[in-house]
Amino acid sequence: MTLHRFKKIALLSVLGIAAISMNVQAAERIAFIPKLVGVGFFTSGGNGAQQAGKELGVDVTYDGPTEPSVSGQVQLINNFVNQGYNAIIVSAVSPDGLCPALKRAMQRGVRVLTWDSDTKPECRSYYINQGTPAQLGGMLVDMAARQVNKDKAKVAFFYSSPTVTEQNQWVKEAKAKIAKEHPGWEIVTTQFGYNDATKSLQTAEGILKAYSDLDAIIAPDANALPAAAQAAENLKNDKVAIVGFSTPNVMRPYVERGTVKEFGLWDVVQQGKISVYVADALLKKGSMKTGDKLDIQGVGQVEVSPNSVQGYDYEADGNGIVLLPERVIFNKENIGKYDF
């Protein structure tokens, strides 16, 4: 073998090894994006995502904007794409605002999924969904109904914003259920805290002051629910039923003091974990279809459902929804079993 031929073979070997290393690295890099950082709900989801990364041997990066904005999420998405990440999983602040950036990412071969809050279905492959709008909207009304024991009542809705996808879907279903099953309930106001703890507390206090005879506040938002509970304590209002969605660690003191009798959520740590497992399966298998099942360590089996379970008309190959196995009602009896 000539020296020239030896050098050529050696160079090709080095380039081949480098290419393999780059492909392995790219396939192992998954970005997990919340609406914003610094909120316990999203931190818990990120913890689940990173736990899954360790189990699967993939590199999961958790990062989000400091405020819930389309521009902040788009900047992160573009950065992750430019850095060569192979999959992006995002809790969208807007159903359509992220679509141009996500479609560009998909055109470059990046796997795009959503969790917690969806985009339009054509802007992602799979949505890791905590529950259908009917399930979660119904859950909100049922929690309120267990405490509002009268035919005529005044109810307020209070959550993050008028544009966030999932909460508006839940509230739409909840209002429809109220109209059908509790026609004597009057929805006196719908207000927003915009994912800001201070503004949420001010808004909640404003609701309770403006409607002194309010029977229930329905707050399906991780900031709005504790704000409503704190507002009731600040104003010494022990007559209003406060229900909604938040994490057990945040709500524990309000439940223990009796300010909140029960509230709901799902295991957001599991949601983060499932999201990464689905992304990893896509990277390894190439695609999944409706009816496909996936076994997840410590969770069990999940299944790909059509977009129609979320009320969407859009269906396509390699596109669908993965529902969490269950949702949870927290109360004084069981809240001690949970830590997230």
From Swiss-Prot:
Signal peptide: 1-26
Localization, UniProt: Periplasm
SUPFAM superfamilies membership: Periplasmic binding protein-like I
GO cellular component terms listed in the entry, alphabetical order: ATP-binding cassette (ABC) transporter complex; outer membrane-bounded periplasmic space
Molecular function in Gene Ontology: carbohydrate binding
Broad class of where this protein is predominantly found: periplasm
Keywords, alphabetical: Periplasm, Signal
Record family assignment: Belongs to the bacterial solute-binding protein 2 family.
Functional note: Part of the ABC transporter complex LsrABCD involved in autoinducer 2 (AI-2) import. Binds AI-2 and delivers it to the LsrC and LsrD permeases.
The name this protein goes by in its record: Autoinducer 2-binding protein LsrB
Native source organism of the sequence: Escherichia coli O9:H4 (strain HS)
The organism's taxonomic lineage, starting at the top: Bacteria, Pseudomonadati, Pseudomonadota, Gammaproteobacteria, Enterobacterales
